[in-house]
Amino acid sequence: PPRDTAPTNFKILVPVMANDLSNAAAAGAAGDVVELRLDALSILDAPNVQNVLCAARAAIGQGVPLLATIRTKKEGGLADLTDAAYGELGTAICHSGLADLLDVEANTAPAAITLPRLRPPKRWSTP
C-alpha cells in the first residue's frame, strides 16, 4: 500500500556539496533536512570531514537535521574509497555527534561498517 504522503508527513531534503558550503544556510532555511555530500571533498579523511561537518552545522543551525552522505564511485558518487576507508569514515561521522543521520550504502556497508547502534532502529509501520 502507498505510504501516507499528506503534507504534514512530507519532508524536503536539500543536498549541499561539502566543497562549497556557501549555500548551506539557505538550504537549512529551505528544507526540513540538509544532506551534506561529503564525497565532493578533495581531502576525504576523518579530520577534514569533522571540520566540514562543524562548518555545515554552524551554517544551518541546530534546528535542522543534518544527513551526512559519502557516495562512492561504484554507487554513482565522487568518493574513490576502499571498503575499509568507507567504514572508517562512517564510524568517525557517527562518533562525531555532528550529523543527525548517516546515509549508508547497502552494497558497501554490510561488508565495511560495523556502526554502533546508538538507539533501537525505527520500524516502519504499514497501514
What positions do the PLM features span?
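N-terminal active-site wall of soluble small-molecule enzyme domains
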Residues: 47-98, 108-110
